[in-house]
Amino acid sequence: MKLDPKVYQLEFFREKGFTRKQCRVCGEYFWTLNPDQEHCNDAPCVEYYFWELPRVRGLSVRDARRKFIEFFKRHGHEYVEPRPVVARWREDLYLTIASIVAFQPHVTSGIVPPPANPLVIVQPCIRLEDIDFVGLTIGRHLTSFEMGGHHAFNYPDKTVYWKEETVRFAFEFFTKELGIPEDMVTFKESWWEGGGNAGPSFEVTVGGLELATLVFMQYRVVDGKYEPMDIRVVDTGYGIERIAWFSQDVPTAFHAIYGELLDEFRKLLGVAEPPRELLWGAARAAGRLDPEDPESVERYYQVVAERAGLSIREARELLGREAALYTLLDHTKTIALMLGDGIVPSNTGEGYLARLVIRRALRTLRRLGADIELAVLVERQARYWGADYYPRLLSHLDYILRVVRLEEERYSKTLERGLREVTKLLKRKKKLSIDDLITLYDSHGVPPDMVAEAASKLGVNVDVPHNFYALVAKKHGASGAVAREVEEKPKLPRDIEEWARGFPATRRLFHENPYAREFTANLLGVRGSHVILDATLFYPTGGGQLHDTGVLRLCGEEYRVLRVEKVGDVVVHVLDREPSCSSGEAWGRIDWDRRYRLMRHHTAVHVLLGAARRVLGDHVWQAGAEKTPEKARLDITHYELPSREEIRKIEELANSAILARIHVDIEEIDRNTAEKLYGFRIYQGGVPMTPRLRIVRIGDWDVEACFGTHVANTAEIGAIKIVNVEKLQDGVVRFEIVAGSEVARYAASLEDKLDTIASIVGGGRGEAVKRVEKLAEELKEAKRQVSRLRSFLADMLVKSVKATAKSIDGVKVYVMTEELPDENIYREVMLKLSREEPDSITIAVIRRGEDLLMEIGAGSKAAKRVDLRAVAKQLASKGLRGGGKPSHITLYGRGLAEKASKVASEVVEVIASLVSRAGTA
């Protein structure tokens, strides 16, 4: 967006005597008190030189965090506790990528007020869009970092503060708190966009290092166009780790952030410290490094090598190992934070992003050649940071380490299988695209450098993009471009939805009194068989709960309510036919038995979730749910299929909560209060876009924001029976349950099945198990006998088939046309002949009704002379379709059973021609 330069002209700049200048390198404009300054003081326009400046020295990350918070508290800002690194309160973002994310979209859109105004927060963030550059840029890029934010929300009728005050705060903080000379602080004009919002900004740069960004969020981005926001937001981001680095006399941000932990990692990984002149030379030159430009990276190594008196190869090798060390420091902290906040690695959503970081760390570890478990490094991080700002790392340490070890084990197996797929692909294609590389990584876990290595052995050149992992992360929503899946969508025609939006909100009698069975209301509108009332007892599909059914009486006639949906706050009833009137009084009655079973199942799901968390761990979150009158399902995040003992324990705990007769409290409270009282666990079934939340609390057992109908006490559930547990996908486990009266129905169905089994095996129910066990043993013995007989028959057939051998230029061709009761015998004969006669080809002709199946196998010597895939290719014109390997093919011919002998002869002819063409071995 092109802006008028006046947007950046502030009274503060005029008062202090700042000059607006244009950077000689990048061409961007900046404000400075130094009349001789020619650069914007930002990377990659200048080398880093901040170590040379007067400044407060020796701030740790903890010191920098404390100093930032205390400064803004003194200036009237209320401190707000940070949120998790997993953005549970948002449906359009997986990770917390900035401090403002904590207040989007509910606060920035005006749905709810901010928790304080103005406020200060230090928010742990995870951002993966620059993951490929971590380590290389010696600290400019990190995947996890702390963002210090002071935010002000300016309403049309109330301005807190805007540009002038924001810039003054920044100037005072950096000059007074950090002791930076005033003429060294540069304000670079910029533009910021993110999370659907945008606005002009200043980047605060000192000595080549960007220390903060001051954004004035005043536009929303809609279809590529900028619309003014009702609420103008001061969105600042101060780099806490960068401030610590800036204050210390150390070459890299990793020295400043990790301190003694860096030395510990260095020993564990066997990475020797580079020569001092090399490391400091690299640190200074990194300011001019543009990691996205391969030529810039090459120049960087040249400059560093020259300054250190080394060859480029030596410099690249030493700095490569150092960058790997920094990468592992960064990634292991990020892994600990992600898992500490309950992410379960998987192939989708935030779970995929966690797996990406884990696997990149594992690959880095292997390339270093370090003989150490990744879990050992992650544990060091958890203990280092858990005592500081992240207590969850210690309380969830067992889960974190178990998952890391499990992921490492899975990755080794995945990699082994994946490399085989790479070899297959490279034999088919002589050039691999970026999409091919991403598919190989996504589907088979093979990193691009390993693909390139395997390709080079086959003479195939593979260009690996410098930002490969960032591309993969972006594809899977690391930048927030991918929305979480929202369960409920209106299932009405578009014209009905538009029509419904024109009505006032429907009064929800199903919430006011979920035990009511009949009601009266006023008819507001009719379109076809769709009806809208001013109030209703009919629950619309939502929160994973199916809608109510029942009867509506309109204008003296009764209509069946078949379906109920919600469009915004308006409830739409779908009737069995179009009503004869469009206004008047309505009377309704819900199908109570159906409703009550739904209520029991919905509360049962909440109880089950509480039990699953207690047994499996605090990382368990709802990944999906459905409540029907007959049964309910709950999908949870978990890294493996629970054991039988764990499932029984979950069921026992859930039923103990029912026996405890816990009261179910339901209240509507404002969002900020709900989050303060109960945390973000309330967002299990989605994130309502409302200022007030309907909170369903089952004592201390479970609390959630929920739209559904519930029983008043857990005792009303009666009982819960888990009827099925399965792994839905990697990282997600599905529980299916029945509750209340459905438990008795389920038990009755099991009894019916048991009676059926008993009648089949003979005897009563009590003897059924023993009789089935006996039958199972008899079946095993019968299978053993069949196997022995099959082997005996195969030996007999081998002798018989050998007598019919046809020799073609040194290759023996055997044809089996016997009709056998078991197709496995053909394959066993073929296998025996191939082993005993390596220079043979065996053809098995198998009739399947009117169709023909042909199995053709070659011994090791014969396979070198004839590629059976060439046989398959020639036979395709004769109606035989199929394929396979050079030594074995399977062909199928529809309607060819009657011509079996003729087809077999044609196959022999094709083989003969190929053998003759190949010549003798």
From Swiss-Prot:
It is found in: Cytoplasm. GO terms for molecular function: alanine-tRNA ligase activity; aminoacyl-tRNA deacylase activity; ATP binding; tRNA binding; zinc ion binding. It catalyses: tRNA(Ala) + L-alanine + ATP = L-alanyl-tRNA(Ala) + AMP + diphosphate. GO terms for cellular component: cytoplasm. Its cofactor is Zn(2+). Catalyzes the attachment of alanine to tRNA(Ala) in a two-step reaction: alanine is first activated by ATP to form Ala-AMP and then transferred to the acceptor end of tRNA(Ala). Also edits incorrectly charged Ser-tRNA(Ala) and Gly-tRNA(Ala) via its editing domain. Keywords: Aminoacyl-tRNA synthetase, ATP-binding, Cytoplasm, Ligase, Metal-binding, Nucleotide-binding, Protein biosynthesis, RNA-binding, tRNA-binding, Zinc. It comes from the Archaea. Consists of three domains; the N-terminal catalytic domain, the editing domain and the C-terminal C-Ala domain. The editing domain removes incorrectly charged amino acids, while the C-Ala domain, along with tRNA(Ala), serves as a bridge to cooperatively bring together the editing and aminoacylation centers thus stimulating deacylation of misacylated tRNAs. Its EC number is 6.1.1.7. It is an enzyme of class 6 (ligase). One of its GO terms (biological process) is alanyl-tRNA aminoacylation. Zn(2+) binds at H602, H606, C706, H710. This is Alanine--tRNA ligase. Belongs to the class-II aminoacyl-tRNA synthetase family. Binds 1 zinc ion per subunit. InterPro entries: aa-tRNA-synth_II/BPL/LPL, Ala-tRNA-lgiase_IIc, Ala-tRNA-ligase_IIc_anticod-bd, Ala-tRNA-synth_IIc_core, Ala-tRNA-synth_IIc_N, Ala-tRNA_lgiase_arc, Ala-tRNA_ligase, Thr/Ala-tRNA-synth_IIc_edit.
